């Protein structure tokens, strides 16, 4: 039996209603245990003066896969500028917005994160995604499978095959790709771009299948609900980045018709067309709609100033954005009757009207959405900025005077267009614990994560109290992963690997022959080759399979 | 080991739907007959792969140190000893699965030295454009179903990618209204390619030797609506066809292009870029034998750089010229030669050689250490990437010839060093 006592800290565990409770946290054999159950001799960490929280959970961060490798390829200057020196626990990687696998695990762990989820697994690339994620140390991972532009699904919907057939297909794909949730990226739009459509509105028909994004969205919302997946549809909506898309976003919220829906990087979908530059903040309207619709959750996709690279499955949007690539190069790919990707390097500048307003819109969303359990802290890494900017973002949320200082640096034209100064709210530590841990665990259905109650996994973080919240959250004093101390005084001291979360909903076996035929005739290789086996996930060790309603 | 689909009375087994790892097309309809350690490929396989899959019943050769047979442990120890004195090692060949490459990265990071794949010339011709300017590319299934006009730029790639047309441009495709049109620009199809293309319309646009770059520049001007200077190859009909196509694809085998390959690719990419303003088009840049693409991908996610990366003092840097296998080898004291997919010979050099190589490799000069390794997809399971970069294919184990994997050999050498 291995045991660890984290003593004398103030426990901040919103999921269990504990706010600054002074108590010891005991981890026995990798799990949180009752205070009384610690053996006599136990390794003790002195957390006096520290805040003790569960390990951080990032619900949306592009950490792996083909698009990340393309980004690394395009950003070789960044790779040269940020090298990770070889050390006892360090690899030989580097990068910031294009961080390599080992460095990703290290930088997240140092900030106190122990689980990070890849939100855009293109099915054809799932095997690569899992292989790469297995090289990321410290973190639990899992993938959201991108559906909604795949020809098989659009054909099912267009041909009126019915909800049951869709459910079987979605379940088959989740099993084949070993993913944990369903993501939709620009529903039907990526597919439409392959048929040369350049725009896709919520009620516009796909040029080939003649079905609308609304239909695709509603069908997949129903599928995940009926399969009983914990996480709702994770939606990157139509018209990303387009001025005036606030209306699309409001219409999309309405289209959910009260069913659970998670809308991602909503900052990029909260733009109005007011003002002399025809670009304005829609944050107030969107926040109001989120506040009124308890079925909706969002993550923000905050923009942070500096060089980054945008990587998305939404080639339709990225092709529109190619002209603003900085440096001036970009890569797009159509992918396997499945989806696509577009990688466009970009530098957000505080003196740019548009970028400065994007920054303000993100913060307005954070501050105007009232329920911290339905909003999650993200920069859509690396699209709004690298995840290493989270401590700075936390300070912006918690420290109004700091926020106002930063606001004063913005392009004057943007300041005139934002109401940010009128918002007095400051996030409390408890709210930070909610948006970075408790709420992500809840929306993902990870019942044994994001809290410090008995039975939870032993992912525990100690932060030293510091009025400078950016400093406080940049380097945790201690990080414990599954009961092992991995960070001590901000330094990595051990190397462990996390687990891969997935769901395995049941499906009607008759779909197998249909998929075999689809792969033989259309895709051009075998469905049997496409399916990922259990042995391929972390060598057959380290999967966590979550229960669904339709379980096998 | 996977369950054989048909067992034979002879004690042999027939395995269906075997994935072929050699050229990068990732065909997975090969039938293998395995009897003891003997292997024969049957249906599905192309001529080249059949030869590469074939194995005799003889036992695998022993490891050797300085030409003398040695136990595996002794060979591992000898390799570790050599590397512990290495000043400037070069890791080359790199014919290995993803796990093998992962272990080579770890070892190279500790010993220092550079890493390249023996077939990377074409990959770097492609990267010269994709890295500096970018492109719009596509994958095999997109071509198969969307592409109504397939333009082969330069020599026929099916020389290297044997079943290319059968796999990628078959007679029918989901969104094709009529027969697919295949244009060979500056090359011509082999007889076998013609057979694979039956049902498609074939057109050949001859380009005089050395004038492909010029032809593509003219094509680019034409699709942009400009009028190129008079003379040269007649390209207006092709330009019109490209503009009228629903989904045109320009494909090339980068390794098969000439010395001006970089420029050919850059011009072809520009044509696709222009077409995409009004219609849809994409590139299919082919490169990728012996898991070249997988090695490059593994480098990108672990190191951040593509192949041709050097390690010094634990820090990696990338230099396409200096760390290319051939140039790095000029100043190398030790060559670690890795070739698990085929008996590829190490290049001539003055360096001492540690060969983690196919058992049938015939060396021009006996390596200081020879460790025969198994082939991913025959002797052990593994992972390899397809030429289109997106799809990777699982390789399975079909026999036990007592051969160690590259990953295992490198891991043990690494442990022996410390």
Identify the residue ranges that each predicted region occupies.
Chain B
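Residues in well-ordered beta-strands of folded domains
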Residues: 33, 251, 284
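Flexible, glycine/charged-enriched surface loops at secondary-structure junctions
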Residues: 278-286
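N-terminal, charge-rich interaction modules
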Residues: 12-13, 17-29, 257-258, 286-304
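N-terminal export/assembly segments and adjacent metallocofactor-ligating motifs
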Residues: 1-219, 254, 415-418
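Non-catalytic alpha/beta scaffold blocks inside enzyme catalytic domains
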Residues: 127-279, 304-306, 310-418
């Amino acid at each position: 039996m291995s045991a660890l006592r984290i003593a004398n800290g103030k426990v901040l565990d919103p999921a269990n209603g504990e706010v600054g409770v002074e108590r010891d946290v005991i981890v026995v054999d990798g799990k949180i245990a009752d205070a009384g159950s610690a053996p006599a001799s136990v390794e003790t960490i002195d957390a006096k003066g520290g805040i003790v929280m569960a390990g951080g959970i990032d619900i949306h961060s592009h950490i792996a896969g083909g698009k990340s490798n393309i980004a690394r390829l395009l950003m070789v200057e960044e790779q040269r500028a940020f090298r990770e020196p070889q050390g006892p626990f360090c690899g030989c990687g580097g990068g910031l917005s294009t961080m390599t696998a080992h460095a990703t695990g290290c930088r997240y762990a140092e900030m106190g994160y122990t689980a990070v989820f890849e939100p855009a697994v293109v099915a054809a690339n799932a095997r690569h995604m899992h292989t790469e994620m297995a090289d990321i140390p410290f973190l639990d991972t899992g993938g959201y499978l991108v559906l909604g532009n795949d020809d098989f699904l659009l054909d099912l919907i267009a041909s009126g095959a019915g909800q049951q057939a869709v459910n079987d297909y979605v379940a088959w794909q989740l099993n084949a790709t070993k993913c944990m949730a369903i993501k939709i990226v620009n529903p039907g739009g990526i597919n439409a771009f392959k048929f040369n459509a350049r725009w896709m509105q919520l009620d516009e028909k796909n040029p080939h299948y003649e079905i609308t994004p609304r239909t695709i969205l509603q069908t997949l919302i129903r599928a995940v609900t009926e399969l009983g997946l914990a996480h709702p549809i994770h939606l990157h909506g139509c018209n990303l980045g387009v001025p005036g898309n606030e209306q699309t976003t409001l219409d999309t919220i309405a289209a959910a018709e009260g069913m659970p829906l998670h809308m991602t990087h909503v900052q990029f979908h909260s733009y109005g067309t007011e003002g002399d530059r025809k670009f304005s903040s829609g944050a107030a309207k969107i926040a109001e709609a989120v506040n009124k619709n308890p079925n909706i959750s969002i993550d923000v996709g905050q923009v942070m100033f500096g060089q980054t690279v945008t990587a998305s499955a939404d080639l339709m949007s990225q092709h529109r954005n190619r002209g603003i690539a900085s440096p001036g190069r970009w890569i797009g790919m159509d992918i396997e009757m499945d989806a696509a990707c577009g990688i466009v390097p970009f530098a957000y500048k505080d003196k740019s009207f548009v970028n400065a307003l994007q920054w303000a819109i993100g913060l307005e969303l954070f501050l105007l959405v009232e329920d911290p359990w339905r909003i999650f802290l993200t920069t859509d890494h690396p699209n709004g900025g690298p995840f290493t900017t989270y401590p700075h973002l936390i300070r912006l949320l918690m420290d109004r005077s700091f926020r106002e200082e930063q606001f004063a640096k913005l392009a004057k034209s943007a300041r005139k267009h934002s109401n940010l100064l009128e918002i007095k709210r400051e996030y409390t530590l408890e709210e930070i614990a909610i948006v970075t841990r408790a709420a992500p665990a809840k929306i993902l259905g990870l019942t044994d994560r994001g809290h410090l109650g008995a039975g939870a996994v032993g992912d525990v973080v100690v932060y030293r109290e510091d009025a400078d919240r950016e400093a406080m959250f940049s380097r945790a004093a201690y990080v414990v992963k599954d009961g092992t101390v991995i960070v001590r005084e901000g330094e990595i001291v051990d190397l462990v690997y996390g687990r891969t979360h997935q769901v395995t909903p049941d499906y009607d076996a008759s779909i197998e022959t249909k998929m075999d035929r689809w792969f033989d005739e259309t895709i051009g290789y075998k469905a049997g080759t496409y399916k990922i086996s259990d042995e391929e996930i972390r060598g057959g060790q380290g999967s966590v399979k979550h229960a669904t309603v339709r379980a096998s | 080991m996977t369950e054989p689909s048909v067992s034979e009375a002879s004690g042999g087994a027939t395995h269906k739907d075997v994935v072929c790892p050699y050229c990068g097309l990732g065909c997975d309809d090969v039938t293998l007959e395995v009897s003891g350690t003997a292997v024969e490929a049957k249906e599905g396989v192309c001529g080249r792969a059949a030869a590469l899959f074939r194995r005799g019943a003889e036992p695998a050769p022993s490891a050797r140190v300085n030409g003398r047979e040695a136990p595996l442990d002794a060979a591992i120890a000898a390799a570790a000893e050599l590397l512990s004195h290495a000043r400037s090692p070069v890791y080359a060949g790199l014919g290995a699965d993803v796990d093998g490459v992962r272990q080579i990265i770890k070892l190279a990071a500790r010993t220092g030295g550079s890493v390249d794949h023996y077939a990377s010339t074409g990959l770097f011709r492609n990267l010269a454009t994709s890295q500096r300017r970018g492109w719009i590319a596509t994958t095999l299934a997109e071509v198969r179903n969307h592409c109504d006009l397939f333009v082969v730029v330069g020599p026929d790639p099916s020389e290297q990618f044997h079943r290319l047309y059968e796999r990628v441009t078959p007679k029918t495709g989901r969104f094709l209204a009529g027969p697919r049109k295949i244009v060979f620009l500056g090359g011509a199809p082999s007889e076998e390619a013609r057979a694979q293309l039956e049902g498609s319309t074939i057109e050949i646009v001859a380009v005089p030797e050395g004038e492909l770059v010029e032809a593509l520049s003219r094509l680019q001007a034409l699709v942009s609506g400009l009028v190129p200077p008079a003379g040269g190859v007649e390209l207006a009909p092709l330009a019109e066809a490209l503009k009228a196509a629903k989904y045109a694809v320009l494909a090339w085998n980068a390794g098969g292009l000439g010395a001006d390959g970089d420029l050919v690719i850059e011009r072809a990419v520009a044509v696709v870029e222009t077409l995409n303003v009004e219609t849809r088009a994409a590139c299919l840049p082919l490169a990728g034998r012996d898991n070249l693409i997988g090695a490059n991908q593994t480098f990108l996610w672990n190191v951040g750089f593509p192949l041709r990366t050097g390690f010094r003092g634990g820090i990696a840097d990338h230099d396409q010229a200096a760390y290319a296998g051939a140039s790095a080898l000029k100043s190398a004291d030790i060559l670690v030669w890795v070739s698990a997919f085929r008996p590829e010979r190490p290049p001539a050099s003055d360096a001492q050689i540690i060969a983690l190589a196919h058992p049938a490799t015939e060396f021009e000069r006996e390596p200081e250490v020879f460790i025969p390794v198994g082939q991913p997809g025959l002797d052990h399971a593994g992972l390899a990437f397809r030429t289109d970069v997106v799809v990777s294919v699982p390789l399975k184990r079909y026999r036990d010839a007592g051969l160690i994997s590259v990953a295992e050999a490198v891991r043990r050498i690494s442990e022996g060093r410390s």
